[in-house]
């Protein structure tokens, strides 16, 4: 779990737009965040397996 201070800091609008960065909306992880879902790869995988993300299914080829 991310530090609460860093999550709050990322939520604020930065003075310069290039300073903004994405964080997972569920756990606060700063890396490997999918913009479309706002979730990190770990939370995305867990929620997809649980069926909590409509339209997401495991690929097979």
UniProtKB/Swiss-Prot annotation:
Pfam family, one: Ribosomal_S14
Record's GO cellular component terms: cytoplasm; small ribosomal subunit
GO molecular function, one term: structural constituent of ribosome
Keywords annotated in UniProt: Metal-binding, Ribonucleoprotein, Ribosomal protein, RNA-binding, rRNA-binding, Zinc
Cofactor notes: Binds 1 zinc ion per subunit.
Cofactor: Zn(2+)
SUPFAM superfamilies found in the cross-reference section: Glucocorticoid receptor-like (DNA-binding domain) (SSF57716)
Any single biological process term in GO: translation
Record flagged with keyword Nucleus: no
InterPro entries linked: Ribosomal_uS14, Ribosomal_uS14_bact, Ribosomal_uS14_CS, Ribosomal_uS14_sf
Residues engaged in binding Zn(2+): 24, 27, 40, 43
Domain of life: Bacteria
Subunit structure: Part of the 30S ribosomal subunit. Contacts proteins S3 and S10.
Task performed by this protein: Binds 16S rRNA, required for the assembly of 30S particles and may also be responsible for determining the conformation of the 16S rRNA at the A site.
Family: Belongs to the universal ribosomal protein uS14 family. Zinc-binding uS14 subfamily.
Protein name: Small ribosomal subunit protein uS14
Organism: Mycobacterium leprae (strain TN)
Lineage, highest ranks first: Bacteria, Bacillati, Actinomycetota, Actinomycetes, Mycobacteriales
This protein's encoding gene: rpsZ
């Amino acid at each position: 779990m991310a530090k609460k201070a860093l999550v709050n800091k990322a939520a604020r609008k930065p003075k310069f737009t290039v300073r903004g960065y994405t964080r997972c909306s569920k756990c606060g992880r700063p890396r490997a965040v999918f913009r479309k879902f706002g979730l990190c790869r770990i939370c995305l995988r867990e929620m997809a397996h649980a069926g909590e993300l409509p339209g997401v299914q495991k690929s097979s080829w």
